[in-house]
Amino acid sequence: MTRDLLVDPDALREQVRGKYREVAVDPGASFHFHTGRGLAARLGYEAAVAGALPDQAVESFAGVGNPFSLRRLTPGERVVDVGSGAGFDSFIAAGQVGPGGHVVGVDMTPEMLAKSRQTAAALGLAHVQFRHGLAESLPVDDCWADVVISNGVINLCADKHAVFAEIFRVLRPGGRLQFADIANGRPVPDGALRDIDLWTA
């Protein structure tokens, strides 16, 4: 099915990628959103869990909620993290599913992927993998995941129908989605939807 999108998805992706490249390279810079350990604490992440992760995994965290507040993951589960960034939620997921589980983080920003991969190697986590890809075309097999998590990512995608279709595709029958995101309960004017700068403002 073809949908008329009011913003160019490729142009929007490039804008978003540029913003999160900055967050990866210079996480201490000033952004219009919060980042790091202080943000994780405000969002209700367990202090002991976040505190056990190295700075590299936490400093570029820019989520909007806590997908684990919905339900704790079960040992042995297979998890896909859509828009995994520097890996903060992926590493928490890895701790919850244990070495018998598996976590695949997917992100489109090379600088974020580099950080997450370096951290996974430093922590010796063989059951965590980070792949380059888009939320609209996840590099994951059909029906692979028990759980899909995401944090503050879907609102930045122009074609949300495509994102949710991909999530449905990679989830096994009976699997679940645990995500945190930004939602607007009122219609957004077309002019605002066409303004790429407003998507990341």
Task: Locate each region found by the language model.
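A short glycine-rich, Lys/Arg-flanked "PGG" loop and its adjoining helix->strand segment in the class I
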Residues: 95, 161-176
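N-terminal auxiliary segments of SAM/dcSAM-dependent transferases
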Residues: 1-43
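Short, glycine-/aromatic-enriched active-site segment of Class I SAM-dependent methyltransferases
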Residues: 182-201
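Conserved alpha-helix/loop element of class I SAM-dependent methyltransferases that forms part
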Residues: 33-78, 88-96
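Conserved SAM-binding strand-loop segment of SAM-dependent methyltransferases
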Residues: 123-137
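Conserved SAM/SAH-binding beta-strand->alpha-helix loop
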Residues: 109-111
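A short acidic, Gly/Pro-enriched loop at the edge of an enzyme's catalytic core
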Residues: 75, 136-147
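Conserved SAM-binding loop
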Residues: 116-117
